[in-house]
Amino acid sequence: MQMYSQIRLEGPILRVIDLDVELAYYQKFGLIPIRRFLGENGHEMIELGFDVNTTPGSQSDNPPILTLMHDSSASRPSHRSAGLFHFAILTPDRESLAATFVSLEKQGIQFVGFADHLVSESLYLQDPENNGIEIYCDRPRELWQFDEYGHVQMDTLALNFQSLLSELYSNNDDMIMNESPIKESMAFLRGAIIGHMHLKVTNLAASTDFYHEMLGFDLMQTMPGASFLSIEGYHHRLALNTWRSRAGISHKEGESGLEQFTVHFTDRASYKRLLPRISKSSLHTAINNIIVTDPDGIKMALVCDGQ
């Protein structure tokens, strides 16, 4: 099923309790406030993006990487609640990923994991309010492997740090002595985009069916407790798992964490083909977009150019 063309994910909205702490954390990524405003619910909103004057590859009309919504009275979700597992920031190349790792490490940012997924290489973090973050780069598409059913081959293997850091260091002695030209301010120096979203759900079959059958995302891979879905042959734009949330608690309005994420269509024909598939019970309109609510109460905005 190849329903869509010209589609992109846009930065998630995170409902945060301590705005100052969260803002300071993400500024270490090189993100800066690009717009401040009051949301429809009266909460202060800050859109964060890269400085187009210092980040080659960033464009002035790029959507924000992330939006923080301040709600000091938000409740903290249970570890078994549905919601955000991580949002994933895609760097343009391997050198950018290596430079971002060194830059963030020099600023004291703590990493919680590293992985080689065959199709990509990844760094994992958690922000001060335990929102998961993946920073990754893709391997060239010609290196991706598919089975006879068109499912992409992915795995979770140890990341080869020596190979990754060799993108920055001229030799092993420099690596040992940490003689890198990378400075603290050089995270995401060539820009980045949102590559995918990974959600915690309570019923994998129901959520997979929702995104696959109702929204038309292609099922690219399954593994115990997880599904990976995509559009246009990418390895995954959306991942779902029940590793800690199986038969757990649906997302509740007013909880900290993921407020919503956005799928942006630049092709009106694809957008129009999608709308009749969506159950009216899961859909409502908002200013300039349509909000779809999945079986766990997670909200996804659907936006189209010229809407």
Question: Can you name each region flagged by the protein language model?
Answer:
Residues 2-19, 27-32, 47-51, 61-62:
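Hydrophobic, proline/glycine-rich low-complexity stretches
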Residues 32-80, 132-139, 218-255, 295, ...:
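Conserved short beta-strand elements that form part of the metal-binding/catalytic scaffold
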Residues 1-20, 86-87, 140-205, 258-263:
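N-terminal beta-strand motif that seeds the catalytic metal site of vicinal oxygen chelate
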Residues 30-37, 111-114, 216-221, 279-287:
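Short secondary-structure junctions
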Residues 9-16, 26, 31, 66, ...:
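Short, structured motif recognition centered on aromatic/hydrophobic residues
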Residues 7, 16-24, 82, 88-132, ...:
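Vicinal oxygen chelate
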Residues 195-198, 205-277:
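Structured core of small recognition/catalytic domains
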Residues 19-33, 103, 203-219:
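Amphipathic alpha-helical segments
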